[in-house]
């Protein structure tokens, strides 16, 4: 995919980032534990699918052994591409649960320098974990972009960058980089 946006002086070309970094390599708040027979998804952990007989058993383990504050189910849709979310998909044939994203109480206390975890903080963390899944979904489904900005008068490249996750160029940050050229 390539989108071109121009004014009298500049040309912005937005293209697919063909070699993006997995957002699970970033400094994430949550840990994503996923099991699938064909795909290596989520974060590397010591846990194995053979250690659990059901998703409920894994969830129980996360709350009891990992002292999870929150454990949110992660679902995958696999049909001519991969998509994940925390709400599930309507197609029963090509979709199902693949794991959980969770955070321990200890990590919350360490990251937020708090002893007591308020309902407000817990709600904010839940939203952040869901956002991590959304970002990973953009990566898995190929919604990562780059751009080049060119001066049309002399064909000189002014700026370029890659690694913008998501299809909304305002939300993903591309227009933050180039907005001064298009005002």
Feature map (PLM): residue ranges:
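Acidic interaction surfaces
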Residues: 1-183
């Amino acid at each position: 995919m390539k989108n071109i946006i121009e004014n009298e002086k500049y040309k912005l070309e937005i293209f697919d980032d063909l070699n993006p970094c997995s957002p699970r390599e970033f400094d994430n708040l949550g840990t994503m534990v996923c099991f699938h027979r064909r795909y290596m998804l989520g974060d590397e952990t010591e846990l194995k699918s053979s250690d659990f007989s059901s998703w409920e058993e894994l969830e129980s383990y996360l709350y009891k052994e990992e002292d999870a504050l929150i454990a949110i189910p992660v679902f995958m849709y696999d049909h001519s591409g991969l998509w994940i979310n925390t709400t599930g998909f309507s197609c029963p044939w090509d979709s199902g649960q693949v794991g959980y994203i969770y955070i321990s109480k200890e990590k919350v206390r360490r990251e937020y320098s708090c002893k007591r975890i308020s309902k407000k903080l817990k709600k904010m963390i839940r939203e952040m974990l869901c956002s991590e899944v959304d970002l990973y979904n953009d990566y898995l489904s190929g919604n990562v972009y780059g751009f080049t900005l060119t001066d049309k008068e002399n064909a000189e490249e002014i700026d370029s960058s890659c690694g913008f996750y998501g299809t909304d160029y305002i939300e993903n940050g591309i227009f933050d980089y180039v907005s001064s050229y298009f005002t």
